[in-house]
Amino acid sequence: MHEVRRATDADRGQVATTLGRAFADDPVLRWLAAPDDGRYARTGPRAFDALLRVTYMPKAEVYMTADGNAAVVWVPPDSWKAPVSHTFKLLPPYLRLSGRRIGRLLKLVTAMEKRHARADEPHWYIPFIGTDPAYQSKGLGSALLAHVLARAD
């Protein structure tokens, strides 16, 4: 069994790096990110770090495996909507990540917020769960899900 613990602000860099690696080949993220000229290796983890610092660490629950190779962001009911000030704080890392594709990213964020607003009942939301590719298929993601789903049920 893999040990899971709540991430602290001191873990933010590790969580951002892990999620950055986990999503490096994600089709949606690749569509949002600027064409990869080696830029994503720098901008991906930085964007995750900014999201964690500005939006998720203050109001969500972030868990990681004890070895730091997998992480999940778990947003409580009715906590998914970020203030407009967060968008302004996130624009610099979003621009570094997306470049000229910034419009795609902002449209996706807006569409997701509209979808949440139409939800029939309060719900927990997982915007990100990921495992460093070098450690995938070892049950780390399952351990994270089991940990948080036990509380949600």
Task: Label every PLM stretch briefly.
Residues 37-61:
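Active-site rim helix/loop that mediates acceptor-substrate recognition in acyltransferases
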Residues 153:
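Anion (oxyanion) recognition and catalysis
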Residues 73-130, 136:
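Conserved acyl-donor/pantetheine-binding loop and adjacent beta-alpha core of acyl/acetyltransferases
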Residues 53-74, 130-132:
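Conserved beta-hairpin
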Residues 3-17, 21, 28:
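A short beta-loop-alpha structural element at the N-terminal edge
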Residues 27-35:
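A short, aromatic/hydrophobic, helix- or strand-capping loop or linear motif
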Residues 131, 137-150:
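Conserved acetyl-CoA-binding loop-helix of GNAT-fold acetyltransferases
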